[in-house]
């Protein structure tokens, strides 16, 4: 229930109030040393605290909190992947902390369902000379457009990415999946999947793509039999 209240405050933009609630609950928990689920609850509260620091754009504080939490939690923890993803992204901004403030503000606006403002600010972030930040902004813009149903625009943005970053790699997969699952253009999807495997033969996504290609081939063979 407490985590839910904190989430509501964050979603409404009340980051300071959310932090006060996090700190208050941590103080209460620390009084009950024998509490059976104390560690789990503390990790959840620390996760929320780290999230608040992220949304506030406090780069150094957020990283310290993030590193501490990553060391504390187990790999099976529900927030582990999110924390590792945030850590990876934060490294892109090591020399561009002003851009980190912009990026974190955008993420908070997305959390508050302010997609129009988010898109405008992502466009501004694309002007950066940092290649990773540039393609991160493009990639996120494309994802928002995709979620809004603006498929063609999403594909245009994806097609403009060519810097061979992790986001370029992911964009190739998304473009193939759009043709595959949304447009049902299986022949185009096959070409895009095969292009991906050719460019990234050692990708962690290769096995799943090969499985999907096999299913598409079977679908096309079934259509030919009909």
What positions do the PLM features span?
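Acidic, polar-rich low-complexity tracts and alpha-helical solenoid repeat scaffolds
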Residues: 1-226
């Amino acid at each position: 229930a407490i985590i839910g209240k904190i989430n509501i405050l964050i979603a409404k933009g009340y980051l300071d109030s959310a932090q006060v609630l996090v700190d208050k609950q941590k103080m209460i928990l620390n009084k009950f040393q024998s509490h059976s689920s104390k560690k789990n609850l503390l990790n959840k509260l620390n996760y929320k605290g780290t999230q608040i620091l992220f949304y506030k754009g406090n780069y150094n504080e957020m990283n310290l909190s993030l590193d501490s939490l990553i060391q504390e939690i187990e790999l099976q923890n529900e927030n582990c992947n999110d924390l590792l993803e945030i850590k990876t992204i934060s490294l892109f901004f090591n020399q561009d902390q002003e851009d980190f403030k912009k990026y974190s503000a955008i993420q908070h606006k997305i959390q508050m369902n302010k997609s129009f403002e988010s898109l405008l600010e992502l466009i501004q972030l694309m002007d950066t000379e940092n290649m990773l930040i540039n393609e991160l902004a493009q990639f996120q813009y494309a994802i928002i457009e995709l979620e809004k149903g603006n498929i063609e625009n999403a594909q245009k943005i994806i097609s403009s990415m060519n810097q061979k970053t992790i986001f370029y790699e992911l964009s190739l997969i998304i473009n193939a999946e759009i043709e595959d699952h949304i447009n049902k253009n299986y022949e185009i999807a096959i070409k895009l999947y095969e292009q991906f495997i050719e460019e990234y033969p050692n990708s962690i996504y290769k096995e799943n793509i090969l499985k999907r290609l096999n299913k598409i081939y079977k679908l096309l063979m079934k259509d030919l039999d009909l």
